[in-house]
Amino acid sequence: MQQHLKYKIMTNIKHLAIIMDGNARWADQHNLTKSEGHKAGADKIRELLPEFLNLNIPYITLYTFSSENWQRSSTEVDFLIKLLSIYLKTELNNLHKNGVKIKVIGRLTLLSSSLQKQINNAIELTKNNNKITLCIAFSYGSRQEIVDACTKIITSGKKAVSDSDIQHALYDPEMPDVDLLIRPGGVYRISNFLLWQAAYAELYFSPKYWPDFNKYDIQEAINDYSKRKRTFGKR
């Protein structure tokens, strides 16, 4: 009964967003370097991919590198950028084989031209896949996204701006509103992540660090979500 209910619930979630938090603290806990913690966090994506595919949730967004993360040490920033490149290189074929469409959102012009090309190649290769969309938020900040959207609208010559105008000017206009936002790591905030898209999202926080997160934790979050009544401001 519980298994049947679980998969019934899953069909109601169109967009799952995850803040992959706690990699550095996990590393400290295990006497490892921050780089080893971030690598463990990236490896967790690979581990959870089968579960993401089984969930049958059309759109999943992972917060991997925020606009504020640029302020960290150059060593840590360089490693995180390198990690994205390595992930795309080693995982792209498997993602493509499993029908995953890749999207990457953020201020990508801050990245090297070679990494931008690698990102564009991954997007182009998988653009016709339709099993799930895996969106990687990298060099991403939601306030910056909204500012960039407004700048785009102003540049187009519009004098009045609607919700629809902003939606169509976002980094990914096709991104559905977030239904469930999960944040591991024991921190209770959303950290400038998908503020526009998560306006009515249900929030789920876990004390577990991201590298310790597993498919049962994902399922627990979804089951918790299923017990909530979403009113969207109505009664």
Swiss-Prot record:
Name the family the entry cites.
Belongs to the UPP synthase family.
Chain sites annotated for binding Mg(2+): D21, E202
Q: What does this protein do?
A: Catalyzes the condensation of isopentenyl diphosphate (IPP) with allylic pyrophosphates generating different type of terpenoids.
The UniProt subunit note reads as follows: Homodimer.
User: EC number(s)?
Assistant: 2.5.1.-
Active site, UniProt feature? D21, N69 (proton acceptor)
Please give the Gene Ontology molecular function terms for this protein.
Answer: ditrans,polycis-polyprenyl diphosphate synthase [(2E,6E)-farnesyl diphosphate specific] activity; magnesium ion binding
Alphabetical UniProt keywords: Magnesium, Metal-binding, Transferase
**Highest taxon, organism lineage:** Bacteria
Q: Which HAMAP family does the entry link to?
A: ISPT
- Specify the species: Rickettsia conorii (strain ATCC VR-613 / Malish 7)
Q: Where does substrate bind?
A: 22-26, 34, 38, 66-68, 70, 72, 183, 189-191
Give the protein's recorded name. Answer: Isoprenyl transferase
